[in-house]
Every structure is written in structure tokens, then in C-alpha cells.
């Protein structure tokens, strides 16, 4: 089987993030692909409409994947995320059994963009640190295409919070 086209698939997660933003949500998106690169799930950030602070795209995707697919299958899948998953999302990816992660924007760079915005409090706990504490491997690739990923957030986190 040929290797996955990580850049194209990651850009698809960027498209999902832009779609979330166009719908008034935070600009984060995630997709899940199988070993052949077939897209299985696409999930936007789910903060709105209920102001769910745990409605991160990666966590929502991991939950949906764990309900739909067997962990043995998920071990061969890749999650593409527009930004590095936070520790909550990394835990969800780990517990779902997803075997590989590719992300765009690093958590540290995201924090420089969002500052101390109340809708995006950031923990300095990289996903690699979370995965390293586990008993099964999760391959991590990223940051990748970080400037493209950062551009999605231009002008989003300044000024008033979303209602």
C-alpha cells in the first residue's frame, strides 16, 4: 500500500476547520482516515451552540470513532488535526486506540495566537508527553504546514468572545 499523502489529508482538516469558523465556531477540524487514506470521519469543533468547553474536534472524533470502529481497526488509522490535540483530546485519541496522529499548528504556537482567551485556555502539556505516558504507541507527526494552520486563526481570538 502506498504511503498516505499527509500534506493533502492535513489540508483537508484545515478545510474542516475553516468550515467550523464559517459556521461561527472555533476554527478547529479533524478527520480520520483508514490505512488506505479513505476518509472515515470529519468533525468540526463543537464549542457552539452549547458553549461546550470539551467540544474539541479531536475529542468528538475520537468518541465517534470508538463507537463506530473496533480498536484493532483504529490502530491502523490516522487522525489529521488542524492543531495539536490538547491533553484531553490526546487522552481520547489514546483511549479510542487511534494509532497515528498528524497535526498542523503546535500547541505552543496556538497559545501565542490565542493568548489568554477565555474560550481557549491552554495547558502546556504536549500530546507527545501524554502519549509517552501510555502503554501503547501512538505515532505523532507534526507540526506540519504550521504557517498554513496558523493562518486559519488570523483575527479569530482578538476582541470579544463568541456568544
Q: What is the predicted function of each stretch?
A:
Residues 49-59, 64:
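A short, polar/charged loop-to-alpha-helix boundary motif
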Residues 28-37:
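Short beta-strand scaffold segments in enzyme catalytic cores
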Residues 1-20, 94-163:
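Zinc-dependent deaminase
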Residues 47, 81, 105:
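Residues that line or immediately flank small-molecule/substrate-binding pockets and catalytic motifs
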Residues 71-83:
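Immediate flanking context of iron-sulfur cluster ligation sites
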Residues 40-47:
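Short beta->alpha transition motifs characteristic of CBS
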Residues 81-100:
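Local cysteine-cluster metal-coordination motifs and their immediate loop/turn environment
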Residues 13, 17-20, 30, 41, ...:
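Small-residue (primarily alanine) positions within well-ordered alpha-helices
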Amino acid at each position: 500500500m502506498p504511503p498516505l499523502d499527509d500534506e493533502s489529508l492535513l489540508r483537508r482538516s484545515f478545510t474542516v476547520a475553516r468550515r467550523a469558523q464559517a459556521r461561527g465556531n472555533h476554527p478547529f477540524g479533524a478527520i480520520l482516515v483508514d490505512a488506505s487514506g479513505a476518509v472515515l470521519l470529519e468533525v468540526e469543533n463543537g464549542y457552539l451552540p452549547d458553549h461546550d468547553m470539551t467540544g474539541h474536534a479531536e475529542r468528538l472524533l475520537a468518541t465517534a470513532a470508538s463507537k463506530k470502529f473496533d480498536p484493532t481497526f483504529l490502530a491502523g488509522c490516522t487522525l489529521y488535526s488542524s492543531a495539536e490535540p490538547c491533553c484531553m483530546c490526546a487522552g481520547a485519541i489514546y483511549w479510542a486506540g487511534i494509532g497515528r496522529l498528524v497535526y498542523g499548528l503546535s500547541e505552543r504556537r496556538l497559545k501565542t495566537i490565542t493568548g489568554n482567551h477565555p474560550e481557549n485556555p491552554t495547558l502546556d502539556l504536549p500530546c507527545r508527553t501524554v502519549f509517552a505516558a501510555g502503554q501503547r504507541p501512538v505515532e505523532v507527526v507534526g507540526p506540519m504546514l504550521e504557517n498554513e494552520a496558523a493562518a486559519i486563526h488570523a483575527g479569530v481570538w482578538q476582541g470579544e468572545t463568541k456568544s
